[in-house]
Amino acid sequence: MNQRVLDISAYQGEVDFQRVKRDGIWGVMLKATEGERYLSPAFEKNYQQAKQANLEVGAYHYLRASTVSEAVAEANFFLSKLKEKQLTLPLAVDIEAPEQRQIEDLAPIAAAFCDTLEKAGYYATIYSTVDWFKTKLSARELDRFDRWIAEEGVSKPNFEKPYGMWQFTWNAQVDGINGRADESVSYRDYPNLIRQAGLNHLTPELPARAISVEELRSMGYQAVKL
């Protein structure tokens, strides 16, 4: 499946999610938090309005951590702002902060963040550029996590490892948004994957497409009770 997904933050200002939905957008990834203290002032409103528009909704955190302990603290802060949220798309950690350029291997930091999300029962994915995935986030220990890759100006990403979403433009024009937005394509049926695995504190809905253990394993989950 190929579905259109936007990532939305306070930068977009007022968003008419009903018009966004009518323009063919399937889901939105909403910026929730950054660092250990920043909560996006637009997150709650964007969440409520996106749900009312019947969009699939996920959330992301902009990582500032430079150590494993800081990553865990940021993940817990992120989680604290997601209580009672019905999220049918992944929780993403956005790794691209300028201060992280000097860190050669970000894998332990990324893994610590995602492990914290998974221990809390959520579906985790890592967002970054293809360049960073090839260099700073290339360690095998991250292969058990899903990826949301970013590369603009190409017909196909220059990346060989599996990924679930590809952000292909930072200049999408979508009805309901003043100005530009980042647009991705989702290749996976995240709502079904997440519900069937009992993640994001969601319960399976019937009827639902049956999901195989092999498909779940391909997403990085080695032991899942169906």
Can you annotate each of these PLM segments?
Residues 121-134:
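Aromatic-lined carbohydrate-recognition surfaces of secreted/lumenal glycan-active proteins
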Residues 61, 128, 151:
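Short beta-strand/turn micro-motifs composed of small residues
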Residues 79-93, 97-99, 136-163:
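Structural recognition of alpha->loop->beta junctions
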Residues 1-11, 140-208:
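Functionally critical loop-and-helix segments that line ligand-binding/catalytic clefts
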Residues 98-100, 131-134, 152-156, 170-173, ...:
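Short Gly/Pro-enriched loop/turn and capping motifs at secondary-structure junctions
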Residues 1-22, 26, 30-123:
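Substrate-binding cleft of extracellular glycoside hydrolase catalytic domains
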Residues 202-226:
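Short, low-complexity, charged amphipathic interaction modules
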